[in-house]
UniProtKB/Swiss-Prot annotation:
SUPFAM superfamilies: (Phosphotyrosine protein) phosphatases II (SSF52799). GO terms for molecular function: protein tyrosine phosphatase activity. Keywords: Hydrolase, Protein phosphatase. Residues 1-115 form the Tyrosine-protein phosphatase domain. Substrate binds at residue 83. It holds the Pfam family Y_phosphatase. InterPro entries: Prot-tyrosine_phosphatase-like, Protein-Tyr_Phosphatase, PTP_cat. It catalyses: O-phospho-L-tyrosyl-[protein] + H2O = L-tyrosyl-[protein] + phosphate. CDD domains: PTPc (cd00047). This is Tyrosine-protein phosphatase 24.
Length: 115
């Protein structure tokens, strides 16, 4: 989360689920919906989770104790990738991509997107 704060990132894109075929693929690095968790000198509040067809959008509020600032960060997670396969159609992935681009434009930030 320090990298998100330091680089002023406003959008995170995740293309994997945390588990695939019952095996852990990645660490869940965010708190549950409507909860906060502190990671070192950064507090992350998961303000909202919205489920779309094939993906989730989470809205986080990030508080940096070092920089005395609070920022809004969005995470888009594609959840329709089948275990050990490829999606039957790309329509949901393309739809998520459009939402990501729109979000980047709305934030007005030229900071990097984290994928």
């Amino acid at each position: 989360w320090m990298m998100i704060v330091e680089q002023k990132c406003r959008v995170i894109v995740m293309l994997a689920k945390c588990f695939e075929a019952g095996k852990k693929k990645c660490q869940k690095y965010w708190p549950d919906s409507k909860e906060a968790k502190t990671f070192g000198r950064v507090k992350v509040f998961n303000a909202e989770e919205v489920k779309y067809c094939g993906f989730l959008r989470r809205r986080f509020y990030i508080d940096s104790f070092d920089e005395m600032m609070s920022v809004e960060v969005f995470q888009y997670q594609y959840i329709n990738w089948p275990d050990h396969s490829v999606p039957n159609t790309t329509s949901n992935l393309v739809r998520m991509h459009k939402y990501v681009i729109q979000c980047l434009e709305e934030t007005g930030s030229d900071a990097p997107m984290v994928v």
